[in-house]
Amino acid sequence: MSSYLFTSESVSEGHPDKVADQISDAVLDAILVQDPRARVACETMVKTGVAIIAGEITTSAWVDLEALTRKVIVDIGYNSSDVGFDGATCGVLNLIGKQSPDINQGVDRKKAEEQGAGDQGLMFGYATNETDSYMPAAIHISHRLVEQQAKIRKKSNSPLPWLRPDAKAQITLRYEDGVASAIDAVVLSTQHDPGIKQKDLVEAVREEILKPVLPSKWLHKGTKFHINPTGKFVIGGPVGDCGLTGRKIIVDTYGGSARHGGGAFSGKDPSKVDRSASYAVRYVAKNVVAAGLADRCEVQVSYAIGVAEPISISVTTFGTGKVPDDKIEKLIRQHFDLRPYGIIKMLDLIHPIYQPSASYGHFGRKPREFAYTNSNGGRVVATAFSWEKIDKAEVLRADAKLK
């Protein structure tokens, strides 16, 4: 029997890189409400006392960038100089320019379905049946831990009133013959007020954050727990570390369980295939696994700038496929339109759906409908995390002729 360990990590919404991601996606969402045809590539940097917003945006929309940036920072929990960063008083610097017309001529077409890719690149999508979310277990649990930290921190009359926004979690899983069997180690570091004693912090974090999340079936006597192992984490957030958009691409995706093409997501409108195609191939891989065609599936797609059709589509099921990989590839080509316009239409991506994805992972989330008011005063219904639907699983299974 083969045995090995695998580790993934996640970070909280208060981590400086995630603060930057959320600001970038908040800007994107605010623009899409007013201008669905906008081209947005918004980058953010946060450091002590300042948020810098830069990038290339072409739009007819007007957004109060300063007010929006401050709101995101305050909503996360950075609302006082006591915690090291105050969204109400920090400086906000706007360095946004327009998207190059050279890119526009490669993307925009008279016929929408001929829309070219906004850049060259390669993207990967992945799914596994080891969790209900079709995500690798280590990253799934890591996300839930930092999500629980924020939930407890923001709770009225919180049992842990000394929690601060910055936090990180890490899970090490033991696999036996390729199947997750036990949690070998748990690491959780959370920013805190200076008055809390380490012993009290460890006990409270175990009870309020770890216990509600960790699957008891995978815990054992040998599971190692490292809670704030340095003994002190008072200075955090943008004071402790400079935060930049797009620096947590492994946290955003599969925790290292699958390959990554290198492109970040936040702040990019869906004409950028770095984002939209990554969402599409997650949708593809998840439906392949949900259909029972494989236990694990990784799909790669690649593009050339200005060209609509993908340059390549490839499938790997790591020996878990119930049908050959080349047959799965043919089914993918038959049932999924992976041209940029096809992806946008298939997943209904031109809506303000992106800020929630900027923390706790872009994948493994539950699709949810919500309504918003567009610039004309009309009510619009959209679906956040539409790429997590498994609405193609049944037809894939039928066409694969699996019983």
Curated annotation (Swiss-Prot):
A single BP term in Gene Ontology: one-carbon metabolic process
Catalytic activity: L-methionine + ATP + H2O = S-adenosyl-L-methionine + phosphate + diphosphate
Keyword check for Magnesium: yes
Any Gene Ontology CC annotation: cytoplasm
GO molecular function annotation: ATP binding; magnesium ion binding; methionine adenosyltransferase activity
Subunit record text: Homotetramer; dimer of dimers.
Name of the protein: S-adenosylmethionine synthase
